[in-house]
Amino acid sequence: MPLADLLAGSLARRLPASPNDLRGPERGVVVLPRHLCPPGLREFDVTDDGDRRNLYGIVLTRGQRNDMTRLVNARLLREDWPELSGSLDPKIRRGCARWLKRAR
């Protein structure tokens, strides 16, 4: 089974119950845990739009529920969604879009 299918299939189990459960920082530098990112690509400035979108893309694609709640901010994710969604695998994008709509 392709990796994208495995990630999409597990997405529902990995997402918090609500986007409102996302309590990540609104500013500062986030250092990703090693299980999410290879060495050298682990620091992301949350106040930099591009860095933040890269961070959120990695966490939504590879992260577990506790990673998402700790590293992703609900308000910033909603603001970034129009641009971020285009960079995600289509199955991940559709799953996240449904999840974000449900919580509005």
Give the residues covered by each predicted segment.
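Long, compositionally biased intrinsically disordered regulatory segments in eukaryotic proteins
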Residues: 1-104
